[in-house]
Amino acid sequence: MDDFAYYWFHRASHECRFWWAAHVNHHSSQHYNLSTAIRQPWTGVLVGTWAPWFPLVLLGFPPEMIFFQSGLSLIYQFWLHTESIHRLPRWFEYLFNTPSHHRVHHAANPRYVDRNYGGTLMVWDRLFGTFAAESDDEPCRYGLIKNISTFNPIKIAFHEWVAMARDLRSARSLREAFNYTFGPPGWQPDGRGPTAKNIRAEWLASIYPRSAYPRSVEPPRKA
């Protein structure tokens, strides 16, 4: 149950800008090693990233059990942040999160972006269609879709909050203000912003003929 809650917390932290603003500093490094694992959010607790675990309390799980299990999950995820381990046995790769799967999660390549949200297990990603395997033909390119050129920890931790405030000042309606805050990162009023969905759709359109375009993915809009 903890891992199920973690999956939805982690997915929301990528698909909702309000939570992404807290989570982004974990992904801002263009290098991938064990030190990446300790680049943790400063503002997550303040913006309610604990909410996906609250239903477990309502179901009767003691809070101390939830905290303990969440701690075990974070310990497990520490060793995933490495390029030194290529692949593990196939059965393990199928069931569990591994360095290979988590490299994909940290990659900004269009084919990899916003994939593999699971903490310990990969079954949730396979079930909900967010799984992607690492390809030997395309090395992972780590970092953000638009990287920030600074090592200042304050700017790294708060740059997305600043960008959100700037976008809110330019909002022309409550709908725009809502989407700038709670929509996907990169959302723009014209629908052509660099969201993960648009980036993936453009990539798919470049490699598949129009007639073979997957129906489950919305084609990119033309300017």
Across the structure, where does each feature detected by a protein language model lie?
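Cytosolic-facing loops and C-terminal tails of multi-pass membrane proteins
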Residues: 138-223
